[in-house]
Amino acid sequence: MKQLKRKRKSNFSVQETQTLLKEITKRKEVIFSKQLNTTINVMKRMAWEEIAQCVNAVGEGEQRTGTEVKRRYLDWRALMKRKKMKANIKLVGSGFPLPTSDLDDSLTEEIDEKIGFRSDTNFDWQNVADFRDAGGSLTEVKVEEEERDPQSPEFEIEEEEEMLSSVIPDSRRENELPDFPHIDEFFTLNSTPSRSAYDEPHLLVNIEKQKLELEKRRLDIEAERLQVEKERLQIEKERLRHLDMEHERLQLEKERLQIEREKLRLQIVNSEKPSLESELGQGEKSIHQPQDIETEKLKLERERLQLEKDRLQFLKFESEKLQIEKERLQVEKERLRIQKEGHLQ
């Protein structure tokens, strides 16, 4: 397989590492935030990109990305932990070794809480000359003939220790200096809980209260709607009762007209029977009977028309009443809709 020549970026210089740690200190609240959500993650990525821009502004010739400066910081932190562990082992001695768990706990606590600088503006770099002598080729662009990814973040242990030794005291000066210079961002994270951690329960309580209030309003609106529906059903029931009464009245009127018709028919039949009376009497009777029958017919017809007129007037009245009720229900429905929209807002 053809060997590909890939360029690897040069190692971080002293100035780049100094700038990196300074910028991390300025953005410690964002970078070391314990909150886990999309907004915080985006802010962290933006912070690392800003740190990378500040590192690139040093002008060492390399363009670092946010991922690279983050990896550089993690390597620096890991090296400090290893050096602290070695120092503790030397102090304790081989005859009285500390338990591994105690070493890990004390080391993690001190690194996380106390790693840092004495001042944001005055840094005490102890080993810059030695760093330049030991790592003189760090600014050179290295070319490797290999097949792996050129952006691989792994460094060899020896190279890493050489590269990072400039930012911490060496073993020859451990007796003259404190254990470590301190970074402010770590101890504030572990010793003082985030203010938002106290605000979150109150926020959840307020949200639950709002939910309960909205649910209560919804139930009130639902109760009003049911009351309106109940009234509408009552009105509908009353209307049906009136219609039943009207139906019965019309049925009685129909029976009455049937009886009148039968009565007229009997009168006609009786008028056609032969009479033994005199011709004069028959003539007078024949004159008066048709007149009486016609009069009765007209009278019955007039009464029927009057009843029909009354019925139509009653139906018209019922129709107007139903129309008014329909409009009232429409207005009530619109009022409930407006009230519901106001509650939701």
From Swiss-Prot:
Residues 4-77 form the Myb-like domain. The modification Phosphothreonine is found at T188. The modification Phosphoserine is found at S106. Residues 141-160 are annotated as: Disordered. Signal peptide: none annotated. Keywords: Coiled coil, Isopeptide bond, Phosphoprotein, Ubl conjugation. GO terms for cellular component: nucleus. There is a cross-link at K9, K114, K142, K237, K254, K273 (Glycyl lysine isopeptide (Lys-Gly) (interchain with G-Cter in SUMO2)). Pfam families: Myb_DNA-bind_5. InterPro entries: MSANTD4, Myb_DNA-bind_5. Residues 203-345 form a coiled coil. This is Myb/SANT-like DNA-binding domain-containing protein 4. It comes from Bos taurus. The lineage of its organism: Eukaryota, Metazoa, Chordata, Craniata, Vertebrata.
